[in-house]
Each structure stands twice: as C-alpha cells, then as structure tokens.
C-alpha cells in the first residue's frame, strides 16, 4: 500500500514538473512564430493560451 502511494505520488509529480517546464516553452515558441506563421495554426499548436 505504501509503495503504491509512493509510486502514484512520484508519477503525479513528474507530470506536474514536466507540464510546468513545457508550457512556458511552448508559449515562448508560439510568440516567436506568431509573426511568421498564421495565428490560427499557432492557436492549434499552443491551445487557447497562445
């Protein structure tokens, strides 16, 4: 039981850390490419935030 909780906590923390670092990088790339690529393509890549 303890090992299961530990494994789940580790898995969730990895996902949170990954999303924390990936999301700003995506938005930065989106902002740079916005002038070159059409905005609707940028929205598809970056989601509603971009």
UniProtKB/Swiss-Prot annotation:
Residues 1-27 form the signal peptide. It is found in: Secreted. Expressed by the venom gland. It comes from Apis cerana cerana. The modification Asparagine amide is found at residue 49. Potent anti-inflammatory agent. At low concentrations, mediates the degranulation of mast cells thus evoking an inflammatory response. Also acts as a neurotoxin capable of blocking a class of voltage-gated potassium channels. Transmembrane segments: none annotated. The modification N6-formyllysine is found at residues 29, 44, 48. Its main location: secreted. Disulfide bonds join 30-42. One of its GO terms (molecular function) is toxin activity. InterPro entries: Bee_toxin (IPR035361). This is Mast cell degranulating peptide. One of its GO terms (cellular component) is extracellular region. Keywords: Amidation, Disulfide bond, Formylation, Ion channel impairing toxin, Mast cell degranulation, Neurotoxin, Potassium channel impairing toxin, Secreted, Signal, Toxin. The lineage of its organism: Eukaryota, Metazoa, Ecdysozoa, Arthropoda, Hexapoda.
